[in-house]
Amino acid sequence: MTKLQPSWPTPLVESEPRLTQYYRFALSNQYTSAGTHTVNYGNARGGGIVAFNRIEVDLLPPGYIQHHTAAADGFGDTTALMKFRIASANAEHGNYILTALLGHTFASSPKNGAATDSWNPVLAGGIGFLHHFNVESALGGIMPTGKIAQQGRSILWNSLVQDHVTPHVFLELENNATFYFASSHDGKLQNFVTPGAFYIYKRKEWKPTEPFLVFGSGIQIATSGFHTYNHNTILEMRILF
């Protein structure tokens, strides 16, 4: 795929426009607006495979959620995702990408998941410039299949800039915005700034056909008056193949 698209690392939070074959091991550690501590082992990450150079299919198994309160711990919901690469070019031919994504979350957890299934359409893209910078943006929504008055709907708009500092290190700064409609959060905005970093590990004699590792970390910091959580630390290890 390196001949067809850019070679940036997958963002910590924002939807990834590139097509990749991977598995992500992740953990998130956050504090709710009430000050309670929640850990998500898995963080709704999983794996994906690429087919026909334009399609990616992902399966995101449920993470295990530990509340550190009287709330019941347990697994969350499962999500399936499909991507279609609309247009792209590698660094030698424009360094850009535009991709459509469609996810479906299955309400599989009565205590730690959503009340109903939901659809998640997203349009994501990015472009590189000045040899070592790239900017990306993704606009999408969460549309439950029922119980709208209870769950509401939301629009997600994420943007970022990445800097390829060294052959092995990328730095990232994301902005993650969620606009709420209906439910008790109707009309509210939740916004985070997310600084992050990635270390790419490849063996000394690595070839493009061989797998490699990416280690990532970052923290979501609330910048809006309304937020359901804050100081969300994210740790990841990825295997790309």
Question: What kind of region is each of these model predictions?
Answer:
Residues 1-241:
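Transmembrane beta-barrel domains of Gram-negative outer membranes and organellar outer membranes
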